[in-house]
């Protein structure tokens, strides 16, 4: 509560609620931050997924934390859960962000592997509002390169259409 009060005094407008498992969690946190603040609710558990509709209806935005979620759900189910969460939240006309393990290899390496690049683009294709880098920029050895890489991928995605010519793809 004290941290929230300090944040509000400093003009913080966005607050994230970790491990929201039920709509009551969102209500309790909302009462602490007030209606004027933006509440981003993190989905990180099986209970959170099971209560997603009610949680999303009470939150201003949803953030899928794939790292914490993968501690409770088999890794091979994460991409499908992510797709379902994104579509469900978008259907409610709420922003949905995806975090964790986007460019994880860039903690140590200057360039991501194709699998991570493809994962980022697939996440954008499914309709994610935004992408959240974490360890890549917090403890990574190449934080600027990670941000530049994600920005470039988003820029290319925003310009790409199914009819983009091979020549355009090769020259830009």
Name each model-derived stretch.
Residues 1-172:
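Non-catalytic helical/linker scaffolds that mediate oligomerization, partner binding
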